[in-house]
A protein has these predicted regions:
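Conserved beta-strand termini and adjacent loop/short-helix elements that scaffold enzyme active sites
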Residues: 69-71, 147, 203
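Active-site-proximal flexible loops/turns
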Residues: 78, 211-212
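Active-site/ligand-binding neighborhood in enzyme catalytic cores
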Residues: 1-90
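An active-site-proximal "capping" alpha-helix that borders the catalytic cofactor pocket
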Residues: 215-216
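Short FAD-binding loop at a beta-strand-to-alpha-helix junction that anchors the flavin cofactor
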Residues: 195-210
Length: 216
């Protein structure tokens, strides 16, 4: 049936868990339609930035000092001392909430991703769409992205990226919080600690341990 063919294998592959261990909202995110509309989302206005996301992020940050490759704590220690405790009125923290508190209550769990790129100089069109998802459990990747279709590229050759779900460990990039019963209970304990941090706002997928779409 539809669930077995399109939902079960893909979901368990992405999350590394049996569907019965996952919250219902994960399944409810999958739209079921009886129309020929092939858009995943139903927002009235949809699109991607001309020139890609790098350009729009650069414009958003224009004139704002940005430091990369520096740990949050070392940055705060460098800029905020006992003699000058109020350098920042508020700090927006979008990293992992358990890492912020040095994992003192235990580790929250996340899913990570691994990307595999391939350039095909003799292939002008690999799959005909920007993104194709693979729902079969036995296929190790969840989707293939063909980049030229995002902006109607017409150049010779094509580049594809295969996206593989992966277990997360410290040092890996955390992409998705795993909102099962155990993790939600632990997050609530961390949230109680966060409420005592008067100068810090916790936001984003990692700071609020919640699956947000990027437009949220």
């Amino acid at each position: 049936d539809v669930y077995e063919k399109l939902v079960k294998g893909y979901t368990e592959k992405q999350w590394g868990r049996d569907c019965r261990e996952l919250p219902a909202f994960i399944i409810k995110r999958l739209p079921v339609r009886f129309t020929y509309d092939n858009n995943y989302f139903t927002d009235r206005y949809q699109g991607i930035p001309i020139g890609g996301y790098t350009g729009i992020v650069e414009k958003l940050l224009e004139g704002t000092p940005v430091e990369l490759g520096i740990d949050y704590r070392s940055f705060m220690e460098r800029n905020e001392s006992k003699s000058q405790p109020d350098v920042f009125e508020k700090v927006l923290y979008t990293g992992m909430i358990d890492e912020y508190f040095d994992y003192r209550l235990g580790e929250l769990q996340y899913r990570s991703l691994r990307f595999e790129e391939e350039y095909m100089p003799d292939c002008g069109n690999y799959q005909g769409n920007a993104v194709v998802n693979y729902t079969e459990r036995q296929v190790p990747y969840t989707r293939i992205i063909e980049h030229k279709h995002f902006e109607y590229g017409t150049g010779e050759g094509t580049v594809i990226t295969r996206e593989y779900p992966a277990d997360w460990k410290r040092g890996d990039e955390p992409y998705y919080p795993i909102n099962d019963e155990r993790n939600n209970r632990l997050f609530e304990a961390y949230r109680e600690l966060a409420q005592k941090e008067e100068k810090v706002l916790f936001g984003g997928r990692l700071g609020q341990y919640k699956y947000y779409d990027m437009d949220k």
